Regions:
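Soluble N-terminal domains of membrane-associated systems
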Residues: 1-103
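Short coil/turn segments at secondary-structure boundaries
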Residues: 36, 109, 127-129
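Cytosol-/stroma-facing membrane-proximal "stalk/adaptor" domains immediately downstream
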Residues: 98, 107-110
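Juxtamembrane loop-helix boundary motifs flanking transmembrane segments in multi-pass membrane proteins
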Residues: 105-108, 133
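Cytosolic juxtamembrane amphipathic/interface segments immediately preceding
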Residues: 110-120
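Core alpha-helical transmembrane segments of integral membrane proteins
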Residues: 119-139
Length: 139
């Protein structure tokens, strides 16, 4: 993968990465405070100050508005699946925090987020164990 300087990214590319972070957290059962916090950390990592970012969350949609001083840019992202995977939530939170505080390369941060996204869609427990747990819980 080529080295990409995050300062040369368009505002649209930056907003997509911020929304990717929020979507990953929302689809894996994170709370709204954590989603907003980690999205703002990702924005700060990309050079966007928190004062210039407005984030609004609903059950299935993330809305972000960024003011770059000249114009405002708005993007929406739909979240179609909702589940619980606290490992993915923890990994995504750590990834955004490490990217910000350790000044991680952009490519490594994006690759890490995509890896977390791929691993979060895999089944954690075997199907027989889920069925057994449901049976025990409902008896």
């Amino acid at each position: 993968m080529e080295n990409i300087d995050r300062n040369n990214l368009t505002i649209r590319d930056k907003m997509k990465l911020i929304l990717d972070t929020g979507q990953l957290l929302m689809e894996n059962g994170s709370g709204s405070k954590r989603i907003v916090r980690d999205m703002l950390e990702t924005a700060a990592y990309l050079g966007i100050y928190w004062q210039d970012v407005q984030i609004h969350l609903t059950y299935s949609t993330i809305m972000i508005n960024v003011d770059d001083g000249k114009t405002t840019h708005t993007m929406f992202r739909k979240c179609y699946r909702h589940g619980i995977n606290m490992t993915a939530v923890l990994q995504a939170s750590r990834a955004s925090r490490n990217a910000l505080y350790q000044n991680a390369p952009y490519d490594r941060f994006v690759t890490h987020l995509h890896h977390i996204q791929e691993s979060s869609t895999r089944r954690i427990y075997p199907e027989w164990m889920v069925i057994l747990a449901i049976g025990l819980a409902s008896s």
